[in-house]
Amino acid sequence: TAVISKIRPLNVTKDIGIKEHDSEGRVLSLELEQFFLVNVYVPNSGAELGRLGYRQEWDIAFFSYLKSLEKIKPVVVCGDLNVAHKNIDLARPKENYNKTAGYMQEEINGMDRLTEGGFTDTFRHFYPDATGRYSWWSFRAGARPKNIGWRIDYFLVSTPFLPKVKDAFIREEINGSDHCPVGIILDLPD
């Protein structure tokens, strides 16, 4: 996990401060003047779902970490959350629901905790009904040219911070990995 910024942060913190969750380098938090930027790579539950239990524990701990930051100032969370939140966030929801890592109900519940706990999915805020908009495609069977994808990369913001977000986007046309860039446009006073 890395962040490149034109703005020098006030502070940079690695991890979430819980030993059992801090050995994989999954979180990088930057304190900026008006908000915290938290870059995250959420644990994948694994092909055989062997890490699903750990994932559930991690989701709870990560949410608590975000809420602790939010007591200080608004939070912008970005990164690979390794979950398709709604059935419109993946090409084949019926085939994958409760069978595939990234679309297990337990993982969806973790995302619900975020969205019901004060964080807004910026892309869905601006494009609530957009279909076929994905940020990840398996390298298997030519999934990307067929647009058989998943939207698992997000920008979530503290809901009171939402008026500062002017747009959210997915750059599907950019290749380079099995993921594509996602982003937001902010309107912040100088």
Model-identified regions with their sequence ranges:
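Short Gly/Pro-enriched turn/cap motifs at secondary-structure boundaries
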Residues: 18-19, 144-147, 172-175
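Conserved beta strand-loop-helix elements of the APE1-like EEP
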Residues: 1-12, 140-163
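Structured beta-strand-rich core segments of catalytic domains in phosphoester-bond hydrolases
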Residues: 1-45
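Short hydrophobic/aromatic beta-strand or adjacent loop that forms the aromatic wall/cage
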Residues: 1, 24-29, 151-153, 179-183
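Active-site beta-strand termini and strand-to-loop segments that position acidic
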Residues: 6, 30-33, 158-159, 184-189
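Metal-dependent phosphoesterases centered on the DNase I-like endonuclease/exonuclease/phosphatase
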Residues: 58-148, 152
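Surface-exposed cleft-lining segments at the edges of enzyme active sites
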Residues: 17-18, 43-59, 95-99
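Surface polyanion/phosphate-binding segment centered on an Asp-His-Pro turn
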Residues: 169-190
